[in-house]
Amino acid sequence: TVYSSGIVTVDKAFTFSSANVRVQPGLSGFDVIKNFTLNQNTVVSGNAEADCNCLWRGIYVYGATTMTTDTDASIQDALYAIRAGFKNTLSIKKTLFSRNFIGIRGTDGNFFLPAFEENHFDGVGPLKGICSLEPLKTDIEAPEAYGGQSSQLITFVAYQTGRGFAGLYLANYSLNLSALPPATQNEFSDLAYGIMAYDGNITIDRNSIFSNIAAGAYFNRRTAGVLFVDRQPQGPNTFSFLGNGQAAIDFDNCVQGMQIRSEQAAAPTRVGITHTTMDGVQTGIFLDARFGGGEFFGTGTHGGFTGVKDNIIDANLGAPQLITNAGISFMDYSPGFSEVEISDNEVNLSYALGGSGSAGIAGIGLVPGSDPGPGVVEVDIHDNRVTLSNDAEVGLGLGSHPNGWIRNNSGGNATAGNGVFVLSGNSWAGIQVIAESNNNLVACNQVTALSAVTEGLLHVNRSQNGQFLRNVLDGPGNGAHFEFDCDYAEYRCNEMIDNTIGLLYDNFAVTGPQGTDSITNGNRWLGTFSVDGAVADISVILGLSEYYYRSVNNETPPSVVPTIGSMWFFPALANATADCLLDECPAPDPLAFAPAARITRLDTLVAEGLAVPSEAPYAEGREWQHWYNLWRKLSENPSLASGNTVMQDFLTGLSGSNIEALWGVQSVIRDSLVSKASFLANVQFNLDTIMQMEANILDLDSLLGLAMSPTQIALLTQQISDQDSILNVRITAQETMCGQFESQRTAAIAGLLTQLASISPIIVCETNLRRVYEIYLLTVASDLGADSSQLAELETIAMQCPLGGGLGVSMAGALHQGLTGILPNQGTCDDIEERGTQKPSKSRSSLTLYPNPNQGSFVVSIPKELTGKHTLLRILDAQGGLVKTIAVNEAHTVSLDLTSLPNGLYFLSLLGDGTIAEPLSFIIQH
């Protein structure tokens, strides 16, 4: 037994073998400046005989020195068992790290770790008190516990005695742990964090396993087997984890398996997580890009990184809510372009959390703050298998996440041929696309339910430009359920099998036309439907979203709810054809399938003011949202308005409006808060050069340690000095470049806030969207938390009826969830019994047309106040196509000869000098 007190300097090679080293608590330990070895069952621990219950400092290693542990050595009761220094070499094998605050701290520069195997980092408490060592841990950081007014930002850690904090704690270090047989892998257990790393590059290849990782007194909501945070604007850092597959469980009984955070906008974080097995987690893998403009690259097109692939996750710990509760979750609040594949994973989800929901695999965004625009795919969820049980809420989901694909998720579960399998319980949805998840594809998925699903096997809510193609929806519950504004939804060639209701439109559903009388959407109804094959409830506005079906190939709904359904569902012509958009399954990768935007009938009705009857509930808010959606579509696809006078007049009419101003904010966010390709290329080149130079210097240091002659020592010393000088110049240049980008980004945020302050909202939709934009820019875009008043504002907006509150309602809810972990309840929309069901009629118009109907000879009476030198009458057909334009100038009565037009429903609108009259409908009947 050896007793040690104070700081002992190891200034010559020294070994403890089969020793029991008792270290005086407090500021005592070892400063190693020459080689130091612990082996043969040596135990270094706090002196239990001392008259206090405090930690000792630990072993600090300095300079080009080697620290070796082996053969069942043990380090216990230290603040930092080992603190590695710049250019150290650590060889750590068969060592127990027990009851330490941190096992190995590596924050002082790169060091060698040539051997790291068969170690056990055990945090079982209670730990001793920190006592006089408190000043030595003031720079240790972790994600803040959320709730209240915090937002899981990185903050300093308060010491707790309940369990060890972290096995490895690293910063700006490139960790590379190579493969080991399962029996000799490193084990991290009973800690708040197994491995915690900030910046740098992390590669872990079948090297370590994690068990019983929970926060304990460090708060339930901040913990992970592995936490990696990329927050310094120094270039693209990387995280790669290759697990054991089915050879061993990588994460066992961990509240979170891995949380990977990208928090800087200079360059996306590269990520690849594959072949892990997780048994007993609440959230398996969490890709977190909420703060500071962070983004992820995780596909084979970027340096071989595969995203999240071939993992097996059993998520069954229904603990208090985390920021996200899912087998695999990708949360992206930034306007830049991420590219992540989540593929070939198997997730078994068996817990429910109520309000915020639990999901097998989820992509969560913050529209419109995180919308990079069309033409890109940010997350591609494909070829996965998810089983839901015990009321788990959602299988696969996109929430406020644009530009996402859910495709080819099928086969391999408890019942063959299921991508999502609802085994038991009362789930919400098999596949869910909600809350402004725009520009998405859901194709070639198979959902099977053995117990009823509440919202739908496919549930689509307030999401535009979605394509839902060739999905199989089998089992009780609504097969496909559309609600609220789902403008330009394409629901084609899906199979609804043995559902409660096969196809449901309710809650003011608007999708745009589902086919025409000559080209149908080819969906099929198979089996029996206990309520109805298809339902459009009394809330929907007719004339906007008719569904056309064929009487072949089981494409006719077996039953349609009376009255409203008969005004929504129509038989097509006898020779009608079906168009699936996608020829066959499986759906190809995103680069091979991206249908172009086009002008639809709904676009024309919106542009003409025919989309929402003026007496309909929430008419003002709904019309504003339709206008905003169309403005966005035309802004993102300017060629659509070319040669189209209706669209050109629509753009002219809204020029200078708040819609244009608010969309302008979105455009500036996309352009000014993200890094450009040329900048990324320079950052990557500099980073590659820096990493190579650092490796060269470490190699020279190794040679220096072996050098014997004065000549060799002098030569190597000079080479190292020269390389250090060049490296410092390169690092300074990199930091300067990234610093300039951050300064530009900060200035852009200030400019956007000024731009928003200049907007004077007229209706609540504009008030909400402007305020949520402001809070977004002041918090997550600036890498800051929200205060209590901002959170209260977000909650108030999020709980409004989305029809009246507009796009800001979805964005407020998503932002509140990202800041607190709590998704506010969506507000209810009143007056269900009074919801409008009329098609546009002359009783609502300031124009008068008579007689109506007739064979085509009409008289139009125009109020005097609406006529002028440039007054136009426009005739549109039932599909919204422009049939005829007539200049009426200052005439108050106009005769129309439309006898050459075929039978059908038509619309009449008037465009005057800065005034658009409310349109009316009429019928030609020969």
Write out the residue ranges for each language-model feature.
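Short, compositionally biased serine/threonine- and acidic-rich segments at solvent-exposed termini, linkers
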Residues: 543-843
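N-terminal targeting or signal-anchor segments and their processing/structural boundaries
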Residues: 111-114, 127-139, 144-150, 154-158, ...
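Eukaryotic tandem repeat interaction scaffolds
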Residues: 425-484
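Short beta-strand/loop motifs in extracellular/secreted proteins, especially
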Residues: 269, 338, 404, 440, ...
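Extracellular beta-helix/beta-solenoid repeat scaffolds
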Residues: 1-162, 169, 187-203, 208-232, ...
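C-terminal outer-membrane/trafficking sorting elements
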Residues: 8, 844-850, 854-926
